[in-house]
């Protein structure tokens, strides 16, 4: 669709993005924080194959029933998380998630090689170098991709408090 109407803006009714990304416009910390920890399709696939969520930087839910998920130490080393992801990359073969990741790596970061343990550090570093630039901040990406509207898949009970100031400023004119 994008090839047939490249100049038209994107109206996304189902964006897997955190609205706070746009409110804060802070740089994404690293490749793992962009591609793994916020993406339930990625971390659920890994979890379904025996990778503990804590090993992916996902803390136990505060509202989880006692004993429903015995949590170990939550991994905070983004590079280790990325290496786990790379080691399990073949799990994504033939999935929509793999199509999306390949597209993001190719089009967003110019990465043409397949992710694997042997090149995990090089790809992690390449993505991180790009994320450190102003061109890869959330609002810059929003503009670059010609997104006019994005509705997020945030929790329906999210108060969106982080957007109050921006909304009030727009109303004042």
What is the role of each PLM region?
Residues 1-9, 15-173:
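Metal-cofactor-binding active-site regions of metalloenzymes
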């Amino acid at each position: 669709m994008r090839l047939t109407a490249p100049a038209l803006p994107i109206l996304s009714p189902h964006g897997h993005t955190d609205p706070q990304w746009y409110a804060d416009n802070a740089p994404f910390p690293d490749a793992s924080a962009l591609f793994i920890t916020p993406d339930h399709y990625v971390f659920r696939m890994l979890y379904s194959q025996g990778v503990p969520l804590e090993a992916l930087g996902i803390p136990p839910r505060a509202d989880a029933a006692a004993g429903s998920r015995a949590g170990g130490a939550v991994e905070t080393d983004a590079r280790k998380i990325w290496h786990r992801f790379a080691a399990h990359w073949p799990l994504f073969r033939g999935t929509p998630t793999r199509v999306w990741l390949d597209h993001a790596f190719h089009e967003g970061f110019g990465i043409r090689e397949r992710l694997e343990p042997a090149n995990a550090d090089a790809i992690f570093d390449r993505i991180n170098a790009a994320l450190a630039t102003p061109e890869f901040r959330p609002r810059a990406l929003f503009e670059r991709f010609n997104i006019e509207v994005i509705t997020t898949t945030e929790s329906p009970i999210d108060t969106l408090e982080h957007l109050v100031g921006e909304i009030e400023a727009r109303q004042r004119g």
